[in-house]
Amino acid sequence: MTTILLKENEPFEVAIRRFRRAIEKNGLIAELRERQAYEKPTAVRKRKKAAAVKRLHKRLRSQMLPKKLH
């Protein structure tokens, strides 16, 4: 479980921000979203493959040289 200690004279909003950052870093929010509803194994594979293809296209797009302007 993620805990934070309140520092002396620390505003509540700052403590909440630190807590949110901590649980985001732990991956708790992502896991909660994944477990919210059951996803078939085939759907998981399909989603992961689509994400991999998207990453590949993004990497290739950034490596391409710009076209020459005449």
UniProtKB/Swiss-Prot annotation:
User: InterPro entries attached here?
Assistant: Ribosomal_bS21 (IPR001911), Ribosomal_bS21_sf (IPR038380)
* Domain of life of the source: Bacteria
What keywords tag this UniProt record?
Ribonucleoprotein, Ribosomal protein
Q: Which GO terms describe its cellular component?
A: ribonucleoprotein complex; ribosome
Q: Which GO terms describe its biological process?
A: translation
Which Pfam families does the UniProt record give?
Answer: Ribosomal_S21 (PF01165)
What GO annotations for molecular function exist for this entry? structural constituent of ribosome
Q: Which family does it belong to?
A: Belongs to the bacterial ribosomal protein bS21 family.
NCBIfam families under this entry?
S21p
Q: What is this protein called?
A: Small ribosomal subunit protein bS21A
Whose protein is this, by species?
Burkholderia pseudomallei (strain K96243)
Q: What taxonomic lineage is listed for the species of origin?
A: Bacteria, Pseudomonadati, Pseudomonadota, Betaproteobacteria, Burkholderiales
List the gene name. Answer: rpsU1
